[in-house]
Amino acid sequence: MYKMQLLSCIALTLALVANGAPTSSSTENTKKQVQSLLQDLHLLLKEINNHENLKLFRMLAFKFYMPKKATELKHLQCLAEELKPLEDVLNVAQSKTQNSIDIKDLMDNINRIVLTLKGSETRFTCEYDDETVTAVEFLNKWITFCQSIYSTMT
């Protein structure tokens, strides 16, 4: 009687293992990736907060969209969709200042990490909040998101 249930359980376990069910090593790798993303977002925020002239400050008033609810790694799709506009604004703003970090390299790194973390899922569609936020608010909210994800993994 229980033989069928046992076989079903074994088949399900094998299917999960074969399809890449999360393991402790993948969790550790994900934690490292989230930590790297967090550091890069902090670097961008630091760069923005080092604005020395009024033109840069005005450029940073450009508005960005935030998802209505960001609680899972798949929501990084929403960050990925706003990275190009953010990079464009920062590149224009950076041309007005001298001693700045290389925005392109930093954004490429963030894009790479986001792509790795969110996975290859392409069917997820972001639901954005109606209100927009500034670049500083945008980065702060994504930093908070990463901190939240990281804390649930520890």
UniProtKB/Swiss-Prot annotation:
Protein family per UniProt: Belongs to the IL-2 family.
Record-level Gene Ontology MF annotations: cytokine activity; growth factor activity; interleukin-2 receptor binding
Presence of the UniProt keyword Protein biosynthesis in the record: no
Native source species: Delphinapterus leucas
Function according to Swiss-Prot or TrEMBL: Cytokine produced by activated CD4-positive helper T-cells and to a lesser extend activated CD8-positive T-cells and natural killer (NK) cells that plays pivotal roles in the immune response and tolerance. Binds to a receptor complex composed of either the high-affinity trimeric IL-2R (IL2RA/CD25, IL2RB/CD122 and IL2RG/CD132) or the low-affinity dimeric IL-2R (IL2RB and IL2RG). Interaction with the receptor leads to oligomerization and conformation changes in the IL-2R subunits resulting in downstream signaling starting with phosphorylation of JAK1 and JAK3.
The name this protein goes by in its record: Interleukin-2
Cysteine disulfide links: 78-126
Lineage of origin: Eukaryota, Metazoa, Chordata, Craniata, Vertebrata
Transmembrane regions listed in the UniProt entry: none
Glycosylation sites: 23
GO terms (BP aspect): adaptive immune response
Protein's cellular compartments: Secreted
The entry's keywords: Adaptive immunity, Cytokine, Disulfide bond, Glycoprotein, Growth factor, Immunity, Secreted, Signal
UniProt xrefs under SMART domains: IL2 (SM00189)
GO cellular component, one term: extracellular space
